[in-house]
Amino acid sequence: MNSTQDTIYAQACEHISDFQFDDRVAGVFSDMIRRSVPGYGQIINTLGDFADKCVTPNSKIYDLGCSLGAATLSVRRRIEGRGCEIIAVDNSESMIERCKQNLSAYVSETPVDLICADIRDIEIQDASMVILNFTMQFLAPEDRQTLIAKIYQGLKPGGILVLSEKLVFEDEPVQHLLDELHLDFKRANGYSELEISQKRSSLEHVMKPDTLPQHQQRLKAQGFSHFSVWFQCFNFASMVAIK
């Protein structure tokens, strides 16, 4: 899943527009997310492990906000021969087009239905696994509860939701420390102060992270009684919830 280096914010911008998953971002997304999200590779690899353990024969897997297909590829490698179908959804045509190319590079008997749509409009049924990988934080906060409810209803008993998100913290010293560590991570991966500042400004109005208790309360309210954080690095975490 090759991409060119992310230099989108390397030059000073007079006007910084809101972040969009457009063609420019899609072209550098693999590099961008690897250099911006600590533990991203570990999360992607472990999605395949979750699928191996939890995906049941003749069921469906939903990758909601599939971007370039990294999660779908990780899962598909581990479920061959189970008669399953993966439904991969993204509302960015540029992401879907590149995802299609990435998926076609690997031979597989597991079909992937690639859909360019808003994940809030997708019906979920017969699912043994649903993936929300750094996706929900871009939805309007008032729509998140409804989405989790729809996922819960569409999961088969024993099915899982894997939810990865950036977190915010009510404890201000903790928030400051983890934020600083994340910034150091980006600096160590070659991002300049200008790039970091401009990217943060572009995300300010479009990415609204929740606290961990907010995620937990939302999962519990919609019927999940078994859930836990399985991975965390700084202010990025991944949770698993079992129906």
Curated annotation (Swiss-Prot):
Catalysis performed (reactions): prephenate + S-adenosyl-L-methionine = carboxy-S-adenosyl-L-methionine + 3-phenylpyruvate + H2O
Keyword check for Signal: no
GO MF terms held by the record: carboxyl- or carbamoyltransferase activity; S-adenosyl-L-methionine binding
Protein family membership: Belongs to the class I-like SAM-binding methyltransferase superfamily. Cx-SAM synthase family.
NCBIfam families reported for this sequence: carboxy-S-adenosyl-L-methionine synthase CmoA, PRK15451.1
Role this protein plays: Catalyzes the conversion of S-adenosyl-L-methionine (SAM) to carboxy-S-adenosyl-L-methionine (Cx-SAM).
Protein name: Carboxy-S-adenosyl-L-methionine synthase
Species this protein is from: Shewanella loihica (strain ATCC BAA-1088 / PV-4)
Organism ancestry: Bacteria, Pseudomonadati, Pseudomonadota, Gammaproteobacteria, Alteromonadales
The encoding gene: cmoA
